[in-house]
């Protein structure tokens, strides 16, 4: 999960700072030309929904965008960053391409074309304030907003680390810590936050200036009979969890695919990457869990499918390269999320499903290693794929001087965990379904979405046929050589 290098300049937050600020003039109080777009009626609601989660006092972003006075100086920068399209640097950071594949996701903060156009017109027409009576009530940011998962049922603190002000990047293991859980519990959400001793708002322009953890790969497991844990040897009660990395938000698991936190487990941080930020910094992570009700057992089991490859051959001084990885689904599968993971040359990833003669592009997304995103599908649009489907991911790479993320495009690049190496992975969540569960899921979807034989639906090749026909087609496909 490493980056190209660990220095502060390589860890830029996708900020709105472009060096351009609209001048503050009385023209801002006038009516907007060509449509009367105003801050109070048109712009404030957009910012509240899609921006203020980060752009607020004590938020991760470098400036607050709550009031008119805070927003107006950044109007032209906001216009530029919201109109970039699904690629690195766009605001809000959401890179799903809207012209292809599934378009129904949970917690989607992206802007519509109409909203992007409104922002542009507002910035170009003098940034009028508008009637204060049109201003929506301000969002409240109380203690509960500190955790996207709501009030956690369990918070575990990792051991403290100390990073010198100027030092090389550090990779290694951090001491494990007991969770204190005395009974098996299923987890429906997990969220990780870094806590450090940096002064508030210091280093706001860069991730490196605000944090020392670039990422942490971790799992939970039960100690062996000698009360010891070998990080290299997963044992009883081992559960893997989403990697904590720069920009990652909370992870929510479908209730029927909740993850098990065994009694007496420890958190095992088996691969951490720390970087210096210009100040000696003491830091630790808080790992928060949200539990399912006691006694709950999830309906589905996690899929064993891993989608990625280590066979990467990224040529020097060349843009528009592709890398591919395939996996065959051993069971009927529901894909809950799509999470591209590349490294510095990575620009974009697509995922497609191959079922017989059908090839469907499920999604394409731009990629920004400064702000890694996962995309959780809405329940009624998560891909439902029959056993034997081939999942194919395509990574689009740029190892040329035009890609400023690459430290030296004259070098050939291969696969690996460290900064100078690369990855091609989909880290999205999947669950396996029995034949009965598969048919049940498709039946519910047919009913809720009013699907017919003439309906085209992406990600569910058998949703528009009868249950008997779906079973027959699955059997026929599996019998083919």
What do the PLM-derived regions correspond to, one by one?
Residues 1-7:
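N-terminal secretory signal peptides that target proteins for export/translocation
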Residues 10, 54, 367, 463-466:
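General secretory precursor processing signal
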Residues 10-23:
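Bacterial N-terminal signal peptides
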Residues 26-185, 189-193, 264-270:
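Aromatic- and Gly/Pro-enriched helix-to-coil junctions and flexible linker segments
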Residues 45-48, 216, 454-457:
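Processing junctions and N-termini across compartments
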Residues 120-146, 158, 162, 434-475, ...:
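Activation corresponds to long, low-complexity, non-globular regions
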Residues 142-431, 445, 449, 457-462:
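His-enriched metal-coordination microenvironments in redox/metal-binding proteins
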């Amino acid at each position: 999960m490493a980056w190209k290098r660990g220095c502060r300049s390589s860890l830029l937050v996708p900020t709105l700072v472009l060096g351009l600020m609209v001048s503050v003039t009385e023209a801002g109080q006038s009516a907007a030309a060509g449509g009367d777009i105003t801050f109070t009626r048109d712009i404030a609601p957009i910012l509240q929904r899609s921006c203020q989660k980060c752009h607020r006092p004590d938020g991760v972003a470098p400036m607050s965008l709550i009031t008119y006075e805070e927003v107006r100086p950044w109007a032209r920068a906001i216009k530029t960053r919201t109109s970039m399209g699904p690629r690195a640097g766009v605001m809000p950071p959401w890179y799903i391409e809207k012209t292809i594949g599934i378009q129904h996701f949970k917690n989607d903060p992206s802007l519509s074309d109409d909203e992007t156009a409104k922002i542009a017109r507002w910035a170009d027409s003098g940034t009028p304030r508008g009637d204060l009576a049109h201003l929506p009530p301000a969002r409240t940011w109380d203690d509960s907003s500190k955790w996207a998962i709501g009030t956690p049922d369990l918070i575990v603190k990792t051991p403290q680390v100390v990073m010198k002000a100027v030092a090389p990047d550090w990779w290694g293991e951090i001491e494990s810590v007991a969770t204190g859980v005395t009974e098996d519990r299923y987890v429906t959400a997990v969220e990780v936050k870094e806590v450090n001793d940096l002064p508030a708002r210091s280093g706001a322009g860069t991730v490196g200036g605000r944090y020392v953890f670039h990422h942490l790969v971790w799992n939970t497991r039960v100690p062996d009979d000698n009360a010891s844990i070998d990080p290299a040897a997963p044992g009883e009660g081992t559960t893997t969890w989403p990697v904590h990395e720069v920009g990652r938000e909370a992870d929510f698991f479908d209730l029927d695919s909740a993850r098990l936190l065994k009694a007496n487990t420890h958190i095992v941080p088996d691969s951490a990457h720390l970087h210096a930020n210009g100040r000696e910094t003491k830091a630790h992570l808080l790992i928060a869990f949200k539990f399912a009700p006691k006694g709950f057992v999830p309906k589905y089991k996690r899929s064993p499918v891993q989608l990625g490859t280590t066979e990467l051959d990224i040529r020097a001084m060349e843009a528009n390269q592709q890398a591919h990885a395939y996996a065959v689904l051993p069971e009927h599968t529901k894909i809950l999320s799509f999470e591209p993971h590349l490294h510095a040359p990575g620009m974009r990833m697509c995922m497609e499903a191959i079922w017989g003669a059908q090839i469907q592009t499920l999604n394409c997304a731009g990629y920004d290693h400064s702000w890694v995103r996962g995309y959780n599908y809405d329940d009624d649009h998560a891909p439902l794929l029959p056993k034997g489907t081939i999942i194919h991911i395509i990574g689009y790479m740029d190892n040329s001087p035009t890609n400023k993320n690459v430290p030296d495009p004259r070098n050939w690049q291969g696969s690996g965990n460290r900064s100078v190496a690369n990855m091609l992975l989909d880290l999205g969540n999947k669950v396996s379904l029995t034949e009965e569960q598969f048919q049940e899921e498709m039946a519910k979807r047919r009913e809720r979405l009013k699907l017919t034989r003439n309906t085209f639906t992406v990600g569910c090749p058998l949703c528009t046929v009868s249950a008997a026909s779906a079973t027959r087609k699955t059997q026929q496909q599996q019998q083919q050589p």
